[in-house]
Amino acid sequence: MNVTAMFIVLLLTMPLTDGFNIRAINGGELFGLVQRDAGNALDHGFYRRGDCPPWCVGARCRAEKC
């Protein structure tokens, strides 16, 4: 496997690893309110930072309905 392929694989797996680590730090609650975003695999940790994902705006974000 060359360096380019390894780099692409690393980029694809980083969000999944990040989500797993966040769950482990938060006590491993897989289905708690903090972990409702399925391990940050899609939004790359928006909830952890307190921001809103790009597809959620305004009052929906403040009401946590995303």
Curated annotation (Swiss-Prot):
Changes after translation: Contains 2 disulfide bonds.
Annotated tissue distribution: Expressed by the venom duct.
One Gene Ontology MF term: toxin activity
Assigned GO CC terms: extracellular region
Signal sequence segment: 1-19
Keyword tRNA processing: no
Record localization: Secreted
Keywords: Antimicrobial, Cleavage on pair of basic residues, Disulfide bond, Ion channel impairing toxin, Neurotoxin, Secreted, Signal, Toxin
Residue ranges of the propeptide: 20-49
Recorded domain comment: The cysteine framework is XIV (C-C-C-C).
Primary role: Probable neurotoxin with unknown target. Possibly targets ion channels. This peptide could be considered as an apoptosis activator in some cancers (tested on lung and breast cancer cell lines). Provokes the decrease of H1299 lung cancer cells viability after 24 hours treatment, and induces a high Bax/Bcl-2 ratio, which suggests that this peptide can activate apoptosis in H1299 cells.
Similarity comment: Belongs to the conotoxin L superfamily.
Protein known as: Conotoxin Cl14.1a
Originating organism: Californiconus californicus
